[in-house]
Amino acid sequence: MALEMRAPLEFWSLMPAMPALMRAPRGDGHPVIVFPGLSASDGSTLPMRGYLQAIGYDVSGWNQGYNFGPRAGILQTAVRQVRDTFDSAGEKVSLIGWSLGGIYARELAKELPDCVRCVITMGTPFSGSHRSTNAWRLYELTSGHDIEKVKDSFDLPKAPPVPTTSVYSRSDGVVAWPASLQNAQSNNPHTENVEVIASHIGLGMNPAVWWVLADRLAQQPSQWKPFSSPSGLPRLLYPDPSRR
C-alpha cells in the first residue's frame, strides 16, 4: 500500500502534461460511460471525464452515488443506463471502468454487446483469485457479498465480445497486476493488456493512462489494432507487457 502514496504526484503531473494530452486523437462525439472504483463516486472520475469531454466525447458518470458493490438493483440500473444512452445517441456506447467499475463495464458489454462499442478497464481484478486484491475485505464489508460467491456468479475471466483493453500497473499497490491480465481468447481476438507506471489510486489521474483512453476511444472497432506507444514519448511510459 505504500506504493499508493505517489498518487498525488500523478495528479499534479497532469498540468504539465496537458499540452501533449490535448494533441491526442480527437473524439467523434460518441457516448462514453465511466464507472468508479470500490467506495468511490463519480467525483473520483470527474477530471478524467472532463478531459474526455474536452477532446470530443459525450461523457457521463454512472450516476449511482458511491460504488459499494453490486447490491440489489445496481447492475439493473446500469443496464438501463447503457440501453437508454444507446437509444438516445443512436450509436454504441464505450464503457470505462476503474477497478471494480471495470467488472461492471465488462459484464455489461457481455450482456449488451449490440449496445457497446468498446471496453477499457483500469486496474480491474477479473482474472485469478479475487483475494489477490488488498481491497477484498473492504469489498465484502461494504457490499455484504462473499467475494468468492460473486466470482462464481460471473465468468469474469472471459473477455467481452467487443474490443477490450485492460490497463494495469505492475506497481499497483491494491490489485496484484496478474489479476488484470486478459488472456488471449478465441471468442474475441480484439483484446489487449497495456502496462503503465501508476499507483492504483492514481490510475484515473495519470497522463499515460489518459493517452491510452484517448487513443482507444478514437479507434474504429472495424479497424482495431493493438495499442502502440506514440512516437516521441519515452518507452518507459508504456513498458512491454510481455516481458518477464
For the regions a language model picked out, list residue spans one by one.
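Flexible, membrane-associating and regulatory peripheral segments of lipid-active enzymes
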Residues: 1-33, 45, 50, 55, ...
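A structural signal for alpha-helix termini and helix-coil/disorder junctions
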Residues: 11-17, 84, 88, 141-144, ...
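Soluble or luminal CAZymes and related metallo-dependent hydrolases
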Residues: 13, 74, 205, 209
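Serine-dependent carboxylesterase/thioesterase catalytic core
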Residues: 30-43, 47, 51-62, 67-162, ...
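Helical cap/lid subdomain of alpha/beta-hydrolase-fold lipid enzymes
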Residues: 110-111, 116-244
